[in-house]
Amino acid sequence: MKNLLIFAAALCAVALQAADGRIRSVYTIPGELNDIVGHVQGAACSTQGVYLSHAGGIFKIGWDGRLIRKCTAPVHLGDIGYANGRIYGALALRKPIDGQKGMIRVWDENLNIVGEKLLPGNVDGCAVIGGTIYYGLDPYGKTPHRGCKIGRMSLDFKDLGVVDTDHGGQCHYGVQTMAADGRDLFCGYYSFGNPPVRCARFAPDLRVCRGTPMLSCSEGFGMIPQEVFPSEHPRFFTVNALNGNCHKWHAMTNPPQIRLDFYEYRNGQFHDVTERGTPPLITRNDFRASDPFIYTDRAAKLYRIYLQTHDTDVYGAGVQMRTSKDLLHWSLPTQVLRVPAKRKCSSVWAPEMHAYNGKYYMFATISTQKGAFPELPVLEPGDWKKIARPKRGTWIYRADSPEGPFTEWSAESIPPPDWSTLDGTFWVEDGKPYMVFCHEWTQVRDGRMVAVQLTPDLKSAAGEPFELFRASSRPDAKPDANATHVTDGPFLYRSHNGSLLMLWSSTCKTGYCVYVTRSETGKLTGPWGPHERIFDLDGGHPMLFRTIHGQLMMAIHQPNKPWEKKRTRILPMLDMGNTLRIDE
């Protein structure tokens, strides 16, 4: 069995080895590490794969980056080390056990617990050389200190004493990560100054510091077995969190993804031997999407999807963008808009990106944080269901490129600030720019579709808003005088015969749905009607785009509930002149 595992590792090594002797980066698969708690604390490896520790447990991934198995830890798990078919982990207990605050725990390669030892202090950093377990102690916290305490014990948990080590520089906390090359111990720690993370190399007796090679290894590193990547010199890997602040992973908008980089230790320093490729693409089913907006970038020959982010996400409230060449596989997100803190934004809704007069404009609805501003008044009296009415409206942002960054362009929400509004979209008629938006049912009971002309520079409204129609005018609306009616997600389209059509959403018996409505005059002022339901499978907030090859498509999110299950659905469409049809 062992020979089979070594053979499998060798095959993987061949696939990862670049022609010039470097090693291609290993990427984990988006979505497979969604159970991570906090960030990666430590790492170790064997011929079977790589072990990544986090506050809540361990992930075991193959050398191809795919998740093999995982286990949980009911305490805060820090760094881990590997030796002789065992994984050794340093744990900090949330509640002391018999007065003990720390623990060394041991797992087999299938992540079954096979032993543990309580310790009096908080521990982090863990490695094994020969028959000795090394672990870091942290009696300092952020207090500056020159050395760190490192404890030792035998494999059967006999205490071998604690040594005060001198790392050669000011640091804070204790040793964060450890690795061993079979002869020496390498300790990663947070230092004061630049760089913020350093590494120190010690002889096994810890009395002599043999150098401070430069390596950023705060999220774990380990030596690679010769069976995986044969080399004259020891080779190590480091863990790198992709896509921003690893303390704010979000399974849908910022899924955890890790990249392993590779280093060779020779002449007292770590030398980068990594060939960094591109992360694997993910499909539309792998990330949450509410109110998706797709822009066809013909110059770049790709598609850009713009999606909301919240104040709890990694980058805060704003808009992120992904790219695709086939509308199925998408890149990791990049943040293209961050809402200024003064707006007190909890989340951005319905971001739309439009090219206009050589610039790129983002229409984004800002929903403010609870209690940040006085609640908006009810404008429709009566005994109908009323819910919270936070300040909400559509702002305009501008950039020189569809890649952003988008910065605030309008000084205030384009619709009246005392209205509860959302989902502003862009339309140009007879050379004049307009915003079409929804006046929310939460304030007026019967949601309205409203338009307002914009100034030529799109900085503000150029006139008074005018109503287009109300949600209650759709044929399947409830006749009850106290019923509420939703308007949502308008998008305007000029058909092949010159008809002006609007796609929009409301509710129906089967949930969320899509309507198409025609202007009887072909003008924005209408009148508008009738309203034809063309999709009723709990999906909506429609928009239209054409593929690079010219095919008309509709993008919606489906389902509408629950929130975390929303995904982008793309449907081919038929332009029928006076209406639109899904091409089934």
Task: Map each language-model feature to its residues.
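Catalytic phosphate/metal-binding cores of nucleic-acid and nucleotide-processing enzymes, i.e., regions
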Residues: 38-39, 44, 51-57, 88-90, ...
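A short helix->beta-strand "capping" segment at the edge of beta-propeller domains
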Residues: 19-36, 273-286
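Hydrophobic h-region of N-terminal signal peptides that target proteins for export
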Residues: 8-17
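Surface-exposed loop/turn elements that mediate protein-protein interactions on large endomembrane-trafficking
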Residues: 20-29, 58-72, 103-115, 149-166, ...
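Positively charged n-region of N-terminal signal peptides that target proteins for export
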Residues: 1-4
